[in-house]
Amino acid sequence: MATLALSWCLPLLILLLPLATSSASAAVNGTSRFTCFYNSRANISCVWSQDGALQDTSCQVHAWPDRRRWNQTCELLPVSQASWACNLILGTPDSQKLTAVDIVTLRVMCREGVRWRMMAIQDFKPFENLRLMAPISLQVVHVETHRCNISWKISQASHYFERHLEFEARTLSPGHTWEEAPLMTLKQKQEWICLETLTPDTQYEFQVRVKPLQGEFTTWSPWSQPLAFRTKPAALGKDTIPWLGHLLVGLSGAFGFIILVYLLINCRNTGPWLKKVLKCHTPDPSKFFSQLTSEHGGDVQKWLSSPFPSSSFSPGGLAPEISPLEVLERDKVTQLLLQQDKVPEPSSLSSNRSLTSCFTNQGYFFFHLPDALEIEACQVYFTYDPCAEEEPDEGGADAPTGSSPQPLRPLSAEDDAYCTFPSGDDLLLFSPSLLGGPSPPSTAPGGSGAGEERLPPSLQERVPRDWDPQPLGPPTPGVPDLVDFQPRPELVLREAGEQVPDPGPREPFSFPWARPPGQGEVRALNARLPLNTDAYLSLQELQDQDPTHLV
């Protein structure tokens, strides 16, 4: 019977053995949690928790860095019924063993009989999982009845983030627990704190912790050891709550200011009353400025205004005449001059006054003209008055009817430098000598060397072939020279008061304009003058040419 019983139980035991083995394995490989932190120097602290209890089993944590040649192992020690912890010591406390580029492989190995079984594994990044050591050296710096200054130090913190830290502190008052204590946060590296609103002669406890701002999984350090301190007792006769007195004074001042503003706004007689209250010595200006009161009745605006009417500031005389300056094309000059010549001239005045003017401003027209030099243009304005030359009347039997004016005196060499007349075919607004060079000086009147000027065909048709200009007579004493000059690109002939006899039959006529005989007056051209080659004629040069007539 016993043999039959054993044979029957043996298959049953074989069937139950795998179930028992699987249940034991599940206890060992139950749900676990493996967490490690780096203190930024030479310590890695790990905590491993297992749901199923392990009996008589030793476990270790092994560390293998990927960039280092060392490896470390620590023994897991039980801290509770289902959790174990250990510290991997990598070197001296203040040595920097790991950096941000290091990765450490951490494994939890548990012993099963004669062999080791891996329970957990993790690729650990030190500077992503930071937890510093708790602050140390807490001490009371200064204590009063309502406040207390406390300082501390941090230990084993890496220089990589020593300036990027934050702190949390809490104070335990009597009758409360640490969990009920309010937290005070310091968002900068500040290794001290001033506790206020404390109760006099009361016992307190203080704790602080630190956390770096770097790292994704960084957490707070453990709380420091509590620091116990006691505030000073309050002196007799003094207010135990000083801030209450300051609050009352501030509120009283605010309400008083509001009431004062309200009264000043709503009171009708505020002006005189305020002047009496805020009366200050203001000097009377009438004592120093008698005219202010006597003439202007105290009106400062009239006193400061000008004593002359505004109309006195406007110019009383007529505005000076501004000579117009025109720029004409080359082919239009001859037509305009011919049209001007066709206009009938007024009869000669009985006073025998002749008006002459001569202007040149060749350089002003050098801007964008055909065949002209390119220089910078400028605006030039001159005022001038016509030159009046009064000539004495000549009576007698030899004087012809009509009282012809006296002949003009020839211009000097200095006058020739600024009063020029171009050739008939080249009636430009400036001297043609600028392009071709100066012409040779003219010889004596009537000589064979005198240059002859050809008229345009339109002018030659109007001039008789048997007319010839008479040479200019000697200068008449007492005849004034030109008074005012204005640079103007026109060619103006001087009117000469000289009776002209009948010209010779074969001598060519050299005047561009001529008046037929019988009218009693002939427009004569000045002698051939040297051409001006200067771009501008300054005012000083004009005065130098005739010092007796200043412009």
Swiss-Prot record:
Keyword Ribonucleoprotein: no
Statement: the UniProt record of this protein carries the keyword Disulfide bond: yes
Entry keyword set: Cell membrane, Disulfide bond, Glycoprotein, Membrane, Receptor, Signal, Transmembrane, Transmembrane helix
Fibronectin type-III domain location: 134-234
GO BP terms in the entry: immunoglobulin mediated immune response; interleukin-15-mediated signaling pathway; interleukin-2-mediated signaling pathway; positive regulation of phagocytosis
One of the Pfam families matching this protein, by short name: IL2RB_N1
Region feature (Disordered): 389-417, 430-484, 496-517
Residues glycosylated per entry: N29, N43, N71, N149
Residue intervals annotated with topology Extracellular: 27-240
One annotated Gene Ontology cellular component of this protein: cell surface
Gene3D superfamilies associated with the record: Immunoglobulins
Signal peptide: 1-26
Subunit structure: Non-covalent dimer of an alpha and a beta subunit. IL2R exists in 3 different forms: a high affinity dimer, an intermediate affinity monomer (beta subunit), and a low affinity monomer (alpha subunit). The high and intermediate affinity forms also associate with a gamma subunit. Interacts with SHB upon interleukin stimulation.
Protein name (database record): Interleukin-2 receptor subunit beta
Native source species: Macaca fascicularis (Crab-eating macaque)
